[in-house]
Design a protein with these regions (language model features):
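Juxtamembrane "helix-exit" motif on the non-cytosolic side of transmembrane helices
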Residues: 29-38, 96-105
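Membrane-interface transmembrane-helix boundary segments in multi-pass integral membrane proteins
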Residues: 45-46, 164-198, 219
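Non-cytosolic membrane-interface motifs at loop->transmembrane helix junctions
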Residues: 39-47, 76-79, 103-116, 140-143, ...
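Interfacial segments of alpha-helical transmembrane regions
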Residues: 72-86, 142-147
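Alpha-helical transmembrane segments of multi-pass membrane proteins
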Residues: 18-34
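Alpha-helical transmembrane segments in multipass membrane proteins, preferentially the mid-helix core
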Residues: 122-138
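N-terminal membrane topogenic signal
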Residues: 2-18
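Short, highly charged, low-complexity non-transmembrane loops/tails of multi-pass membrane proteins
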Residues: 206-225
């Protein structure tokens, strides 16, 4: 059975390190908010950034072990990886374009965990997608998977907001007008589809000529020697 190349093993170590750094940033922010009596768990864990960061930690740690053991990523893992790349890029753009600079209410958290979650982990994930070896090409059917979680999150957030009068982001507040809310939701959804489409197209463009794009249910098998 073919094992991982030295480059793949280096990629695995980098993924593990990135996952641990993101985990440290998230835990630090949680502990800081708890210590300063600023933690409202049901609100904190309702933020898209926080949920996506937790998923990203799992994907990076799993991907690290996959890269250390296998010469090629599996198709299901690659779809999960493409999804977190998409979510991270969209989160970074939305945060830096719409939310950066908005004053915090109450306790002001230490900034570096937020910078890791909204900037640096995105840079790493994009570079990993562009240059890490062992990524199978994905079919366009993978596109429908990446949009499921964001749509479910929006639906949950709007229903929860209607019941509690709390919304995690200003552009989702009905006080700005439902037309405005709808415009932001549709615009961000379109951006998610666009980013995911670019990621899938890149995976197909960079695949070896002999390799066919993989369906979500197919798993890449190591090559026998």
């Amino acid at each position: 059975m073919t094992t991982s190349s030295p480059v793949r093993r280096a990629v695995g170590i980098l993924r593990l390190a990135a996952g641990l750094v993101l985990a440290v940033a998230l835990v630090f922010q949680i502990v800081e908010k708890v210590v300063n009596n600023d933690m409202i768990a049901e609100e904190y864990f309702s933020y898209f950034t926080i949920q996506a960061s937790m998923v990203t930690i799992v994907v990076l740690l799993v991907g690290g072990f996959v890269a250390l053991r296998l010469p090629v990523d599996t198709a299901p893992y690659t779809i999960a990886r493409m999804s977190v790349v998409t979510y991270s890029v969209v989160t970074a753009v939305v945060y830096n374009a719409l939310l950066r600079g908005i004053p915090d209410e109450g306790f002001v958290v230490t900034p570096w965990p937020g910078e890791i979650m909204h900037v640096w982990i995105t840079v790493y994930l994009v570079l990993d997608w562009l240059f890490a070896p062992g990524r199978p090409a994905l079919r366009w059917t993978a596109l429908r998977i990446v949009i499921i979680y964001p749509l479910a999150w929006v639906a949950f957030t709007l229903v929860r907001g209607a019941l509690t009068a709390w919304y995690p982001y200003p552009f989702l507040e009905p006080a700005t007008g439902w037309l405005s809310v709808a415009a932001y939701v549709v615009g961000i959804a379109a951006f998610i589809v666009a980013v995911a489409s670019l990621a899938i197209a890149y995976s197909q463009w960079r695949r070896p000529r002999s390799e066919e794009p993989m369906e979500p249910e197919r798993i890449a098998q190591p090559t026998a020697t």
